[in-house]
């Protein structure tokens, strides 16, 4: 994914302004306390990958990123990022080549994050809040990182900055899966004064997207499980899957306040098949969040985030009660989360945040508290030069 400081800001260019190389590093260390596994770890009752998820409790590396951007000259550049979450192995989050034939156009090919807007794209990692928003988790299995080609257009018209993006993707990650011929994405955004508005659409047509049976477990993965002929501990979906989203952000130039909101709609239509039967499935999952931040003083901020996720699911055919039991769909209850955050920013690139919250899904509720240390260095070489000149 287009990560590190630049990508998590959602809009900044990760390539150096002039020909040369930039190396950056960013990370978040977290200690989270909760009396039991958080409901969002598995999101029971929602159709997802069906894995055991990542246990957020205890002390762990929430996210670490080492990235490098290389601008060959005005038109060509390359970017790569290596990331790590918790005990998961390190993985390539981004590896792409970019061509900019002019000031307005850019063509990016390789592994990257499809454009979803200034609110949705960066939400969830190196964020102000510790946990990935429920709506983003349910729609994309946390983050959408994919291999493909994306064409972008940027232009200032009057007092507004316009953005358009279109992408073609391999589509093997959730909500795509095996057999996806090609996934499509479209994004449009406008920034005018204090406000930014974004909308996006994504379309997948998997022929073998798997979901592990509720009792099968399995390690955490961003990819959709691959179906096989045996269908052992697996339920397979074949059909159309779409995600639509819209978001808004307000960054006041006059007040120490900011606010944002996002809504995502994930729609599935197609057959579900397992050893126990075949059913026609229709699922509509709608979720979103609102967030507000008050900069109490230059080094202190107070924030709150409210979230809700709900789903309407229809399953018809022979043996559908057994399929629903395999998937744990009978455990469905609307999910919600509320969190309050106090942040201390002692210097640029360093933040300490205390967060308390509560969340519910699948019929149970859990409180949690987290202490996080987040750091980010855009340009390691420049930081070292600055440190050497300091008295």
Predicted regions and their residues:
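Short, well-ordered turn and helix-capping elements at secondary-structure junctions
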Residues: 11, 84, 170-172, 215, ...
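N-terminal cationic amphipathic segment used for targeting or macromolecule association
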Residues: 3-10, 128, 246, 293
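Outer membrane beta-barrel
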Residues: 18-38, 53-171, 178-184, 189-197, ...
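Short, solvent-exposed loop/turn segments at secondary-structure boundaries
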Residues: 175-179, 363-365
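Short glycine/proline- and charge-enriched loop/turn segments
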Residues: 42-50, 126-134, 319-324
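Outer-membrane beta-barrel pore domains
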Residues: 53, 95-100, 198-205, 212-391
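Outer-membrane beta-barrel biogenesis signature
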Residues: 1-56, 207-210, 300, 346, ...
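Hydrophobic alpha-helical segments
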Residues: 42, 76, 88, 107, ...
